[in-house]
């Protein structure tokens, strides 16, 4: 290998972009097969290949940043910009769902009974499970901030406690959301209310699961001494993502659960 006279990481040849693209092709083709042929085999294969690709690719990134020292300050700065742009793209993603909700709710059409919620829809009580979910996510936001301060102060014990608590709160939120879905008196097929409710809250729930896995990975890396008080961007990215999930939930709660009911 030739001498590298700069601080930027030149990525080694990797098969994971190719396997990731193949997994995406299998999953999208499998989704069409599931819809039209009622067969999940192709989508399951794509999902397995995608999970294996994610594991191997992220393992390589951890190895490069933690053990090989490739994540210099300029590289970390680039990763920060990348994470910020990713979160901005997620904001745009959820903005579409809120647009659909407010487009339907602010000017209900005659098909909806000129009222919101539409005629025949019994919305959930915003002061029961949704309010508990709000408290759970806000508490998890506090605990992940506690974990961040503990890392910067080199307090391993409190970092472990705070990260464990955050992951448990994320799992508790997911369990409450599943229970709520089972108890809803309407379905996704019940017009624009049902579709906007389940798509918006469902994608948020998916992001909570992803964020919980992100933080669980950070906890396992922390237990193996991968983070220092100065070098812990993997955790920072997870914390940013988690705070983003918290903020989205507050907008969902105020818009769909409270105002929309």
From Swiss-Prot:
EC number: 7.1.1.9
Major location category of this protein: mitochondrion
Mitochondrial intermembrane side: 35-40, 106-128, 184-190, 257-261
PROSITE patterns, sorted: COX3
Mitochondrial matrix side: 1-15, 67-72, 153-155, 224-232
Catalytic activity: 4 Fe(II)-[cytochrome c] + O2 + 8 H(+)(in) = 4 Fe(III)-[cytochrome c] + 2 H2O + 4 H(+)(out)
Topology relative to the membrane: Multi-pass membrane protein
Transmembrane segments: 16-34, 41-66, 73-105, 129-152, 156-183, 191-223, 233-256
This protein's UniProt keywords: Membrane, Mitochondrion, Mitochondrion inner membrane, Translocase, Transmembrane, Transmembrane helix
Subcellular location: Mitochondrion inner membrane
Record keyword Transmembrane helix present: yes
Family affiliation: Belongs to the cytochrome c oxidase subunit 3 family.
Assembly description: Component of the cytochrome c oxidase (complex IV, CIV), a multisubunit enzyme composed of 14 subunits. The complex is composed of a catalytic core of 3 subunits MT-CO1, MT-CO2 and MT-CO3, encoded in the mitochondrial DNA, and 11 supernumerary subunits COX4I, COX5A, COX5B, COX6A, COX6B, COX6C, COX7A, COX7B, COX7C, COX8 and NDUFA4, which are encoded in the nuclear genome.
Name the UniProt record assigns to this protein: Cytochrome c oxidase subunit 3
